[in-house]
Regions:
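Non-catalytic peripheral regions of patatin-like phospholipases
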Residues: 2-70, 94, 103-107, 130, ...
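Alpha-helical segment proximal to the catalytic Tyr-Lys
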Residues: 90, 98-102
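Secondary-structure boundary motif
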Residues: 77-80, 148
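Active-site glycine-rich loop that binds ribose-phosphate moieties when present
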Residues: 68-77, 109, 113-124, 135-143
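Short acidic-hydrophobic surface loop/beta-edge motif
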Residues: 122-127, 211
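Short, basic and Ser/Thr-rich N-terminal targeting/leader segments
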Residues: 83-85
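Short alpha-helical scaffolding segments that buttress acidic/His motifs in well-ordered protein cores
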Residues: 89, 112-116, 179
């Protein structure tokens, strides 16, 4: 029940932050977090054009991000750091082109901002002198930590982007939306194929399942909601 209340508070805070800016004092924020019905409004179109022609270092030189205040308000980072529930947050190391995972003890506002940093909307988030972007470019979500962590053999996957759409996109914005879905789904598809390959080898008796370095037989489950995610 506490989790439901916290999630409700998060979305209400995001709604308030977006609502304050709907008429233009932060068009990028509105375009990112406002509902789908705004996609055909002049505000949305101007925000899209701005993001395609200017970088966030130009249109947001002071690096303002309303999400920082939202996270500060909603998330109890001290409780998260001390929690027995293992958390893994993925980011993309810009200079190295590699994924970096942050665990409980390392989590902070900056880490969460980095994990959600779309580079055409926000400046890279620096942590310990290194710039980071959204982790979804390389791990969306990262599955491999769960293979080595103290977790059950059942893994439940909740996809955020639809894997399949029934129509061929023809409008420019719809094409870009579908391209982003494919790009962000690609790391997950690659990991799922690797998981399936390893599981096949285990079933064939070709991989060791004993000892600390043994492979585990995992059961993958997914809540598929492509029809809802496509709306």
């Amino acid at each position: 029940e506490g989790a439901r209340k916290a999630l409700d508070k998060l979305w209400r805070e995001i709604n308030l932050s977006g609502g304050r800016n709907i008429f233009g004092d932060s068009s990028i924020w509105s375009a990112t977090f406002s509902p789908a019905w705004m996609k055909d409004t002049p505000l949305w179109r101007s925000a899209e054009s701005l993001a395609m022609t200017m970088s966030p270092y130009q249109f947001n030189p002071f690096n303002l991000n309303p999400l920082r205040r939202v996270l500060d308000t909603v998330v109890d980072f001290e409780a998260v750091r001390q929690s027995d529930i293992q958390l893994f947050v993925a980011t993309t190391a810009v200079k190295k082109g590699r994924v970096r995972l942050f665990e409980n003890a390392e989590l902070s506002v900056d880490v969460l901002l980095a994990s959600a940093c779309l580079p055409h909307l926000f400046q890279a988030v620096e942590i310990e002198g290194e710039p980071y972007w959204d982790g979804g470019y390389l791990a969306n979500p990262p599955l491999w930590p769960l293979f080595y962590a103290s977790t059950p053999d059942d893994i439940l996957l909740l996809p955020l982007n639809p894997f399949q759409r029934d129509e061929t996109p023809r409008d420019a914005d719809v094409i870009m939306d579908r391209l982003n879905e494919i790009v962000f789904n690609a790391p997950l598809v690659a990991e799922l194929r690797a998981v399936a390959f390893v599981q096949d080898l285990i079933e064939a008796g070709r991989l060791n399942q004993t000892g600390d370095d043994g492979y585990r037989k995992l059961r993958m489950h997914a809540i598929e909601a492509d029809s809802h995610l496509s709306d």
